[in-house]
């Protein structure tokens, strides 16, 4: 089976894993997925992540985070997708839940949150929103 949108697949695996109260989820690894996992870890949405498997087929393992038995991530959804890319300038980046959530962007300086992108004055492709 060919995968057309690996980022949507990653977000869906995280969402499904948390709905099923899984401790960790595994998926094929890529540089973009690792960068996205790093941002999620820095923002406190996941416990940790690790890269396992062989060099030719690395696997990304993400440890999910719960608080009082409930998933920390209430909402995680893809914004820009292969059929409709969404790009925002630094002044157009939306605030998620009035600043309680984060938007994750792919910029020329790497993958970062909406707050960091606004502070740096750069825009980019709006990958997903997390709350």
Curated annotation (Swiss-Prot):
Entry's transmembrane regions: none
Name of one Pfam family that matches: Ribosomal_S8
Annotated Gene3D superfamilies: 3.30.1370.30, 3.30.1490.10
GO annotation, cellular component aspect: ribonucleoprotein complex; ribosome
Keyword annotations from UniProtKB, A to Z: Ribonucleoprotein, Ribosomal protein, RNA-binding, rRNA-binding
RNA-binding recorded as keyword: yes
GO MF annotation terms: rRNA binding; structural constituent of ribosome
An example Gene Ontology biological process: translation
InterPro entries referenced in this protein's UniProt entry, alphabetically: Ribosomal_uS8, Ribosomal_uS8_CS, Ribosomal_uS8_sf
Quaternary context: Part of the 30S ribosomal subunit. Contacts proteins S5 and S12.
Function: One of the primary rRNA binding proteins, it binds directly to 16S rRNA central domain where it helps coordinate assembly of the platform of the 30S subunit.
Family: Belongs to the universal ribosomal protein uS8 family.
Official protein name in the record: Small ribosomal subunit protein uS8
Source organism of the structure: Chromobacterium violaceum (strain ATCC 12472 / DSM 30191 / JCM 1249 / CCUG 213 / NBRC 12614 / NCIMB 9131 / NCTC 9757 / MK)
């Amino acid at each position: 089976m060919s995968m057309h949108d690996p980022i949507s697949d990653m977000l869906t695996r995280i969402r499904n894993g948390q709905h099923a109260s899984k401790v960790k989820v595994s998926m094929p690894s890529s540089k973009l997925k690792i960068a996205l996992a790093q941002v999620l870890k820095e923002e406190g949405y996941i416990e940790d992540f690790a890269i396992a498997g062989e060099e030719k087929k690395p696997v990304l393992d993400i440890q999910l985070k719960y608080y009082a038995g409930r998933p920390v991530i209430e909402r995680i959804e893809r914004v820009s997708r292969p059929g409709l890319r969404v790009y925002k300038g630094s002044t157009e980046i939306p605030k998620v839940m009035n600043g309680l959530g984060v938007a994750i962007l792919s910029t020329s300086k790497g993958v970062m949150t909406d707050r960091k992108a606004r502070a740096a004055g750069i825009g980019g492709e709006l990958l997903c929103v997390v709350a």
